[in-house]
Amino acid sequence: LCALAEQNAVRNGFGDRVKVVNTDITAPPSLLRAAGLTREGYDQVIANPPFNAEGTVRAAADRARAAAHVIGAEGLSGWVRFLATFAAPKGRLTLIHRAECLAELLSLLDRRFGAISVFPLFPKRDEPATRIIVQGRKGSRAGLRLLPGLVLHEGDGSYTAEAEAVLRGGEALDLGG
């Protein structure tokens, strides 16, 4: 996935401005530095933490795949702590997670990040959001904004025109930032 992210950055003209790092968020600081990470060195930190708690899903046989799907003992707090460590002052954090984890995420971001925007992703019209994209600015005291979000699928399962525009047409999501 890291190679794909790097290829996408190059393809979209950001190859010289994007750094993709494949590391373990629980690694000791010396290993993180060796991987090229700089404390408070990034204007934007982005994460897609695993959504599933250990024991709630059948673990994949492949260790790397299992790690990508099951959050470790560090939980969401470890992910937020990691991202906060590497976000520059006034830098942005962006992550996607389950909608049911919103309260926990807001609590973890409190006093570290402000100007929080919550962008819900709805599987279909008239269904509750199942995923959220949360974005905040490190050190900001600005308040929370709940954005309109995006409906992903029509009743027949096909993508909505808005989702197609993002997924296939390169349209940006308006995260209000």
Predicted feature locations:
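SAM/dcSAM-binding transferase cores
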Residues: 128-177
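Conserved Class I SAM-dependent methyltransferase catalytic core
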Residues: 72-129, 133-134
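Conserved SAM/SAH cofactor-binding pocket of Class I
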Residues: 1-58
